[in-house]
């Protein structure tokens, strides 16, 4: 499903074209420029650009395994597969949590399922672009990893945030992500990890830890920067479209908050098939706990709401 239509000014296209013509598309200065600019949205001291949000999640769970050993990771089943797989890959225990009526992390269900056998990690999903989760209530000793793939400007408090700049996201690039944190030690680990575990020396480099090719290149950073500069204008257009379509469909629209990205409009309706067929829409996402790879469990509200979901793109010419 195409969720967004991106517009670039002639100036932006010229800047991107000049970068391509220069040949400086691999390593380059715009990665750091983008990281520094993004601090305004993440409200975190350290922002590490990656080649995908999946890579960012992978590094987070690698770091947490190294720091705390096996952890318990609590997350909704209504999410993209790669962050959950990354946690499982590093040996963490996956415990699926139900969602509330807004399709967001249900804290009450988490508190019922929580055990203290390992360090507890919660990974809420900012579904549809919301920036916060009303009624957010934890014990206070958890590590909070925010899946902000839909929302580049989260206001919910967390220890680690990963954001997506996939071509279909509110800030776009050919592909890319950002990992944001205030923890200096972790930031240094991530900077090395995304660059094959390397640290530069006077004449070459040394391998100081595990790592992989997870860095963002200069071309992706340049495109993401231009998209970032258009974010506020494009957001206003998405808000207008959201307001416009609320009168066109019957059912319950999920709420957006003042810092939401309005990634898409989610409609809960008893018979979604006709709308999904008409607009060629797919539900974000298949439920992970119902897939072959993950352990089945009971998530009553998730299972009751999932067949009723319609995710509507917020570009006006669709309607």
Located regions from the model:
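Active-site region of PLP-dependent enzymes
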Residues: 152-264, 293
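Conserved PLP cofactor-binding pocket of PLP-dependent enzymes
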Residues: 198-203, 244, 272-310
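Active-site phosphate-binding strand-loop segment of PLP-dependent enzymes
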Residues: 101-173, 178-180, 185, 311
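Conserved PLP-binding active-site segment in aminotransferase class I/II-type PLP enzymes
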Residues: 1-67, 229, 319
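Proline-centric
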Residues: 94, 98, 311-319
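Conserved PLP-anchoring active-site segment centered on the Schiff-base-forming lysine
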Residues: 59-115
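Generic structural signal for small/hydrophobic residues in well-ordered secondary structure
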Residues: 16, 38, 56, 73, ...
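Short beta-strand segments
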Residues: 51, 123-125, 223, 255, ...
């Amino acid at each position: 499903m195409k969720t967004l239509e991106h517009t670039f000014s002639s100036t932006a296209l010229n800047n991107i074209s000049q970068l391509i013509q220069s040949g400086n598309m691999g390593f380059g200065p715009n990665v750091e420029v983008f990281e520094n600019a993004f601090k305004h949205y993440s409200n975190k001291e350290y922002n590490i650009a990656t080649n995908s949000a999946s890579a960012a999640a992978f590094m987070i769970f690698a770091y947490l395994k190294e720091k705390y050993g096996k952890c318990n990771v609590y997350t909704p089943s209504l999410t993209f597969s790669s962050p959950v797989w990354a946690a499982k890959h590093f040996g963490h225990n996956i415990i699926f949590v139900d969602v509330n009526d807004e399709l967001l992390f249900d804290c009450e269900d988490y508190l019922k399922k929580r055990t203290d056998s390992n360090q507890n990690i919660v990974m809420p999903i900012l579904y549809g672009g919301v920036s916060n989760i009303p009624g957010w209530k934890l014990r206070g000793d958890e590590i909070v990893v925010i899946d902000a793939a839909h929302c580049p400007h989260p206001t919910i408090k967390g220890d680690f945030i990963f954001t997506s700049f996939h071509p279909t996201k509110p800030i776009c690039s050919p592909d890319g992500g950002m990992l944001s944190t205030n923890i200096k030690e972790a930031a240094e680990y991530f900077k090395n990890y995304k660059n094959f575990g390397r640290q530069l020396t006077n004449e070459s480099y040394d391998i100081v830890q595990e790592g992989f090719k997870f860095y963002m290149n200069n071309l992706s950073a340049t495109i993401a920067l231009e998209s970032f500069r258009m974010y506020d204008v494009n957001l206003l257009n998405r808000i207008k479209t959201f307001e416009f379509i609320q009168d066109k469909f019957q059912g319950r629209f999920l709420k957006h908050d003042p810092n939401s990205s309005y990634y898409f409009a989610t409609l809960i309706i008893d018979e979604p098939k006709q709308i999904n067929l008409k607009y060629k829409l797919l539900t974000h996402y298949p439920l992970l706990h119902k897939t072959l790879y993950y352990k089945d469990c009971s998530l009553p509200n998730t299972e009751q709401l999932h067949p009723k979901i319609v995710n509507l793109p917020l570009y006006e010419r669709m309607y």
